[in-house]
A protein has these predicted regions:
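Non-catalytic nucleic-acid-binding/docking modules located in mid-to-C-terminal regions
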Residues: 2-4, 52-57, 125, 144-148, ...
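Noncatalytic, basic helical substrate-engagement surface that gates or grips nucleic-acid strands
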Residues: 2-133, 137-161, 233-236, 242-250, ...
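Short hydrophobic beta-strand that contains or immediately precedes a catalytic carboxylate
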Residues: 9-10, 132-134, 334-336, 400, ...
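Short active-site loop/helix that positions an aromatic residue
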Residues: 16-22, 140-145, 343-344, 404-414, ...
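Active-site-proximal helix-loop-helix substrate-binding element of RNase H-like nuclease domains
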Residues: 106, 157-185, 304-312, 344, ...
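Conserved "right-hand" nucleotidyltransferase catalytic core of DNA-directed polymerases
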Residues: 230-373, 435, 443-444, 455, ...
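Conserved catalytic core of nucleic-acid polymerases
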Residues: 466-469, 517, 521-524, 579, ...
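C-terminal polymerase-core module
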Residues: 543, 547-550, 554-607, 775-823, ...
Length: 910
């Protein structure tokens, strides 16, 4: 019996977008982006190697309007334009596809989905097997006994039953399903507030959209009202979502035969794109699409776990709980998701817990769901008591996504979570800190290729949002169990990539993951705030603001609101006729801070406005707000430290942000006076001195800088002496100030123009200073030039500890964006290395505090500074040990200097 012929249809446009968004940005030495092309070529090679198709077509959307645009003028109107760095990769990719011998289709007037649907239907009618490679849910409507979908992102396949398992509707119901839920990306209206669950429920009950419409009057509740309100657009939504599989195409199936690759053309393309591995494969006889080759360490090429049909269980009986406890006890890795009612971890009340130990299988244990008709749940105390030995078992490895939050929630119930080996949020962050936001929804979309359930889909938004405890338990199970399930899948994909890069693995295992319990303890400790002192400062700031307001009214010749940009424009530029130095996006004269700073050099009123704004910000952000954030139980303020926000590796402090309290003004420093120690205790602050300049000396290896630090000279005075060719003792204060600005300006990639602006000198003079600096410190210039070149070639720079800092705009055609990325390339290794060093110091200090009997706590991390609370009689020991441990946190070619002080409050200790 002859084997059935196979046709493979590839959603080329989908491949391109997914490769662009899922892979680290790459570019060749000319600065041309190439990462998406490489990703698609590798995916095509893999697909052809595994499927060996006789017939194949790679289908792309053609430019121009389609019949859907004629049906609905707003179709896809909300889509963001294709990024320039993606657009520039389209033609090179088309060239590569053709050179690989793969038939390429771009048909004007129709979408790629319609071409794929038509060819699939024709082939199935001729008894061929059809495999459609796509991540697009719309094409699920084409699945039949002969037509299957494959998602190369997850290696998962969807036959008819697979579609039913994934969407809870059959393929022939998909267009009705899509019409109901709509599509925000394609701007398909759908029915307001109708999500996948409701759409599937209706279609399972009524069979078709037409039958649902006939029975619309019988659908009760708010969702029924929404259905009836949207009936007029439903047919339009269905037409927009339905694939036209009856096109008349000029090509026939036999024209889709896979051809021999054009090796010479591939050599030319791969040489220009600098795909060295693919070039080697050609020379080794593996030029054809599908020939074996080692893929780069990218997510698409990882052995990502297939996403099987899900089996999510709600645990409502002790028997079910006991069965899951037995499974968890023998699991290699437990994925844990804690669902709680408050984003404030000090107030978080656990509503339920979800577990997963294998992809596709998970359980949710509801504890506190409280709504009319809610099923009986196991007593929370009973469940937590049963789980406590497992959760506190250090030997049972656990993983979560931002699991520190769950750790806090469990702490409130007397459970100390142990055995946390992995966190998929941190894995995503270590793999590529700039690729995406690191919330679970975004990470799943990027690395698993599907859109998970969203929290707000369950709870609603804004004023009408309900607490999770009022979400129906079956719906909550789908959400919470999926959260636990995808964490395991993300770990499989991300850890394979991270563990393949030794420096990244070290960064994760020795810095990021060990830091989690340190931050947890700092957050639990909180910091003592003198609320009454802050309230007094608020009154004083308000008085200063009133005084400034009175003087401003006098200077302007009449009253106006200093808080109103429009009134400021009228007074500054209309009434007083000050020069317009900048404009807003709408063309209005700007009152931004930078503009006012420049005007304040010559005019009195702009300086008053800046002072007023400074006082207003201190008042609203700190002196008014901090007393309200004192926890009613601990009587302390508890910030939240985020590891996966700043691209450079810096920690972020939020709710409240305690890292941006000003220190350069007397009023800002006074706020730090409200950070106090309890009676008998004191505050100790330990601060790295000029750490980024020391890192610059290490990275550049410049003999002059290294010598200055080795001899413990005043680095700014030493720089001034070098630049101005003076003995150290003859350097003036102004010359030292200039040298300081040059030192720090160069770290942040400041140009001669920026330096001139900061110093208030001519650009030519600033340029001369920079040239003199580089003459005296040639190693710094060499390091900067080499770093910029490496950034262009690789698309990223690295810290001393191997943290990769991707520069998405390093190859941009936009000069401003490109130059900004080049400045980041210089600064990021220094800022990132400083972040890595203080994290290492925190881990070592915490290890010492945890194993010693010293009465002290680490409270805050603020940039290059650690703040402690210690009993007064132990302060000297802490200060000596903190200096020692922080100084030893990294071995650089320069020593790390740590300044340590103590006092009754933070200001005194600094």
């Amino acid at each position: 019996m002859n084997a059935r012929r196979k046709l493979v249809l590839v959603d080329g446009s989908g491949y391109l977008y997914r490769a662009f968004h899922a892979l680290p940005p790459l570019q060749n030495s000319r600065g041309e982006p190439t990462g998406a092309v490489l990703g698609v070529v590798n995916m095509l090679n893999k697909l052809c190697r595994e499927e060996s198709p006789e017939l194949i077509a790679v289908v792309f959307d053609a430019p121009g309007r389609t019949f859907r645009d004629e049906l609905f003028e707003q179709y896809k109107a909300t889509r963001t334009p294709m990024p320039d760095d993606l657009r520039s990769q389209l033609q090179p990719l088309l060239d590569c596809v053709e050179a690989l011998g793969l038939p390429l289709l771009r048909i004007t007037g129709v979408e790629a989905d319609d071409v794929i649907g038509t060819l699939a239907k024709q082939a199935a009618a001729k008894d061929m097997d059809v495999l459609i490679s796509t991540g697009d849910k719309d094409i699920a409507q084409m699945v039949s006994e002969r037509i299957t979908l494959v998602n190369t992102m997850t290696d998962s396949r969807l036959d008819r039953q697979g579609v039913k398992n994934k969407f809870d509707v059959w393929p022939e119901q998909i267009m009705d399903y899509l019409a109901l839920i709509g599509d925000s990306i394609d701007n398909i209206p759908g029915i307001d507030k109708v999500g996948p669950k409701t759409a599937a429920k209706w279609l399972n009950e009524y069979g078709t959209l037409d039958q649902l419409v006939k029975n619309a009057a019988a659908v009760s509740g708010k969702v029924g009202d929404n259905l009836r309100a949207g009936l007029q657009t439903l047919e339009l939504s269905r037409k927009l979502a339905t694939i036209d599989s009856n096109l008349t195409l000029e090509c026939d199936l036999e024209s889709l035969v896979r051809r021999e690759p054009n090796k010479q053309r591939l050599r030319e393309l791969y040489t220009r794109l600098e795909f060295r591995q693919l070039l080697r494969a050609i020379e080794g006889g593996a030029a054809a699409a599908g020939a074996p080759m080692t893929p780069p360490p990218a997510v698409e090429s990882a052995a990502a776990a297939a996403r099987p049909p899900t089996n999510y269980t709600t645990v409502l009986t002790m028997e079910d709980l006991q069965r899951w406890l037995e499974r968890l006890q023998s699991a290699e890795l437990i994925a844990l998701h804690v669902e709680a009612v408050s984003l404030d971890y000090m107030e978080a009340e656990i509503v339920g817990l979800a577990f997963s130990i294998e992809p596709g299988t998970a359980a949710y244990v509801p504890l506190l769901h409280d709504y009319a008709g809610a099923p009986q749940q196991l007593p929370a105390a009973t469940v937590l008591q049963a789980l406590q030995p497992l959760l506190e078992n250090e030997q049972l490895a656990k993983i979560g996504h931002h699991l520190k939050y769950g750790e806090h929630a469990l702490k409130r119930k007397g459970i100390e979570l142990r055995g946390m080996r992995f966190d998929s949020m941190l894995e995503s962050y270590v793999w590529n800190s700039t690729a995406t936001r690191h919330e679970i929804d975004a990470v799943v979309r990027r690395y698993l290729g599907f859109d998970p359930l969203h929290y707000e889909d369950l709870t609603g938004r804004g004023a009408k949002q309900i607490p999770f405890s009022q979400v129906a338990i079956d719906t909550a199970t789908s959400y919470a169990a999926e959260n636990a399930d995808v964490v395991l899948q993300l770990h499989r994909v991300l850890w394979e990539n991270i563990s393949g890069v030794p420096a990244m693995r070290m960064l994760y295992e020795e810095i990021e993951q060990p830091l989690v319990p340190v931050l947890y303890r700092m957050e639990q400790a909180g910091v003592l705030i003198d609320g009454e002192l802050l309230r007094q400062q608020s009154l004083e700031l308000a008085r200063h603001m009133r005084e400034i307001e009175a003087r401003a009214h006098e200077a302007a010749g009449g009253p106006f609101s200093l808080d109103s940009p429009k009134q400021l424009q009228d007074v500054l530029y209309g009434k007083l006729g000050l020069p317009v130095l900048g404009k807003t996006a709408t063309g209005q004269p700007s009152t931004a801070e930078a503009v006012l700073e420049e005007l304040a050099e010559k005019y009195e009123l702009p300086r008053m406005i800046l002072d007023y704004r400074g006082f207003a910000k201190l008042k609203s952000t700190y002196t008014d707000k901090l007393p309200l954030q004192i926890n009613r139980t601990s009587q302390r303020v508890h910030t939240c430290y985020h590891q996966a926000v700043a691209a450079t590796g810096r920690l972020s402090s939020m709710e409240p942000n305690l890292q941006n309290i000003p220190i350069r003004t007397p009023e800002g420093r006074r706020i730090r006076q409200a950070f106090v120690a309890p009676p008998g205790w004191c505050i100790v602050a330990a601060d790295y001195s000029q750490i980024e300049l020391r890192i610059m000396a290490h990275l550049s290896g410049d003999a002059g800088l290294l010598s200055a630090f080795a001899e413990e000279r005043d680095i700014h005075q030493a720089t001034a002496a070098e630049v101005f060719s003076l003995p150290l003792e003859q350097v003036s204060d102004d010359q030292r100030r200039t040298a300081k600005m040059i030192n720090f300006g160069l770290i942040y990639g400041m140009s001669a123009f920026g330096l001139a602006s900061r110093l208030g000198i001519e650009r030519s003079e600033a340029k001369r200073y920079v040239e003199l600096y580089f003459e005296r410190y040639p190693g710094v210039r060499r390091y900067m030039d080499e770093t910029r070149q490496q950034a262009r070639e690789r698309g990223y720079v690295e810290t001393v500890f191997g943290r990769r800092l991707y520069l998405n705009d390093i190859a941009s055609r936009n000069a401003a964006l490109r130059q900004g990325a080049e400045r980041q390339a210089i600064n990021a290794p220094m800022q990132g290395t400083a972040a890595d060093i203080i994290k290492r110091a925190m881990i070592e200090v915490d290890r010492w505090l945890s194993t010693s009997s010293i009465p002290a706590r680490l409270l805050l991390q603020v940039h290059d500074e650690l703040v402690f609370e210690v009993q007064q009689d132990a302060a000297a020991e802490l200060m000596a040990r903190a200096r020692e441990l922080m100084s030893a946190a990294a071995e650089l070619r320069t020593s790390l200097k740590v300044d340590v002080g103590s006092g009754a409050n933070w200001d005194e200790a600094h």
